Design a protein with these regions (language model features):
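Short aromatic/hydrophobic contact patches that present stacked aromatics
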Residues: 61, 145-149, 341
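Loop-rich catalytic cores of soluble enzymes, especially ATP-dependent carboxylate-amine ligases
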Residues: 93, 104-335
Length: 489
């Protein structure tokens, strides 16, 4: 979520936000806990909600759920979302800040000084920047996604990843909402997704860029998926010295010496490493915990995410990764539960302009619409696979960049998005189909958030600061209590 100063529209790094959020949680009878890294509060943990940061103090992230799926599941999630969003907006108001309806701040500095001033104190970022050579600062302007997560049986996981990857052009186009950067139009409707080639342009390891790109063929199974992420030609990231599942928050980590792939690392009983905080030599004991911990490595448009109930022995895990036994079966034996993380939809929220133009019914579905699309596709998996086959994997890969650049103005992207929505609608329970409302409205009118933002930007006069302030005033996210009643700006 993109945070801005309420008066100027400039990017805003939160200060008292976490204390404000804690008070709101306590007022509802919850017992929130604040999470700290390097002496700074970075999240508030409460019942079913992690109210934290993405990569910086100007870029908020709230992780919610899980909720029971099936009929009514989207409404159950929406109830949590609207409560959390109301809390976020109220907490920000206490420090003179607002959320902007955009998937990237329209005019935020990304130089090294600005980056260091607001970056979250997550140790992994030091490894990315100082050792792997990533240009992590290109995302410090709050490039924000609305990432739907949908549980999936392990036996269907690879098929589900394939479908969500293939549907990327539709998801990108329908939720495009970042046409500006540095106070200027970029020529892209979803400039947010320019992040990966820029971040990895000077990376030390070629695999980092490769793992952000959709492969040229479908994954055959989960072992195939993980071999691409963890196998020959890849380099594992730092790992915790103690047991941890929090890849951005683990505070004591080590870098394995020699830059091995994870599969090479797991094949040994011990591996030398270097402690990231002290520089001391350590010995690491390879474990299935490392397999679970490093699941973030593919920065794809969709990822399979999971959690073991108990950790399998490494020899059994390696057998499955090498295809000598079924990985899905092994993971099930050790109590793993999995879900698909969609990473294409840009952040979209109701603002006064959308409410006036599309109406309250559409505005009320904006936040949930991406989840509805993904849930519908995965509930209608066979038809979704037929759609992908009809269009062709390579053709859909080629549609991704036109979706980033032109969104629904591209005729083929528009046609594909319409077919995706039809398959998703058929997969949803009749009572849940209205959650597609925003996506349907965008498709029917070819009016993405990016299109509306560009119109606003071109209509504004004044200097750069005045234009930003005017844009921010019109892009301010409405409090859920206003979604049916806000006055037109």
């Amino acid at each position: 979520m993109v945070v801005a100063n309420q008066k100027t529209g400039r990017s805003h790094a939160v200060s008292g936000y976490f204390d404000s959020m804690s008070r709101r949680k306590r007022a509802r009878g919850q017992v929130p806990q604040q999470k700290q890294l390097s002496g700074k509060t970075v999240a508030v943990l409460s019942d079913g909600v992690d109210s934290g940061l993405d990569n910086a103090f100007n870029h908020l992230e709230s992780a919610l759920g899980p909720v029971q799926g099936g009929a009514g599941g989207l409404a159950r999630l929406d109830a949590m979302v609207t409560t959390e969003l109301g809390d976020v907006i109220d907490a920000l108001a206490e420090e003179g800040a607002v959320l902007l309806n955009t998937s990237e701040h329209p005019d935020c500095p990304t130089d090294e000084a600005a980056y260091r001033a607001v970056r979250a104190p997550k140790p992994l970022y030091d490894h990315w920047v100082d050792y792997r050579g990533w240009q992590h600062r290109v995302g410090i302007d709050a490039k924000a996604q609305n990432g739907p997560t949908t549980s999936i049986p392990l036996a269907l996981a690879a098929r589900a990843v394939n479908v969500v990857l293939a549907a990327a052009p539709a998801s990108i186009a329908l939720f495009a909402n970042s046409p500006l950067e540095g106070g200027m139009p970029t020529g892209l409707k979803e400039n947010r997704l320019s992040i990966w080639p820029r971040m990895f342009a000077a990376a030390k390891f070629p695999c980092d860029a490769r793992l952000s790109q959709t492969p040229g063929r479908r994954f055959s199974d989960l072992a195939d998926y993980f071999r691409r992420a963890y196998g020959v030609g890849t380099v594992m990231h730092t790992v915790p010295l103690a047991s941890s599942r929090d890849y951005k928050g683990a505070s004591h980590t080590a870098r394995p010496e020699g830059d091995p792939s994870l599969m090479r690392f797991l094949a040994e009983s011990a591996w030398p490493g270097i402690a990231c905080d002290s520089g001391e030599s350590v010995m690491l004991a390879p474990s299935a915990m490392h397999f679970e911990y490093l699941q973030f490595m593919p920065f794809l448009d969709a990822r399979f995410r999971f959690r073991f109930g108990s950790l399998p022995p490494v020899p059994e895990l390696l057998e499955a990764l090498h295809g000598r036994r079924n990985l899905e079966t092994l993971m099930a034996e050790y109590g793993a539960e999995g879900y698909i993380e969609g990473r294409c939809p840009g952040a979209n929220f109701p603002d006064a302009g959308l409410l006036a133009e599309a109406g309250a019914d559409v505005a009320a579905t904006v936040v949930m619409s991406a989840s509805a699309v993904q849930a519908g596709l995965l509930a209608n998996l066979e038809e979704a696979e037929k759609l992908v086959a009809d269009w062709g994997w390579q053709r859909l890969l080629a549609l991704r960049q036109p979706a980033v650049a032109a969104a629904l103005d591209d005729a083929a992207v528009h046609a594909f998005a319409g077919e995706v929505l039809a398959v998703a609608r058929a997969g949803l329970d009749a009572g849940d189909r209205h959650w597609l409302g925003y996506a349907d409205w965008v498709w029917q009118n070819k009016r993405t958030g990016a299109d509306r933002m560009l119109e606003t930007w071109h209509s504004l006069g004044g200097d750069r600061d005045q234009r930003l302030a005017g844009l921010a005033a019109q892009q301010t996210v409405l409090h859920p209590s206003q979604w049916a009643t806000a006055a037109v700006i």
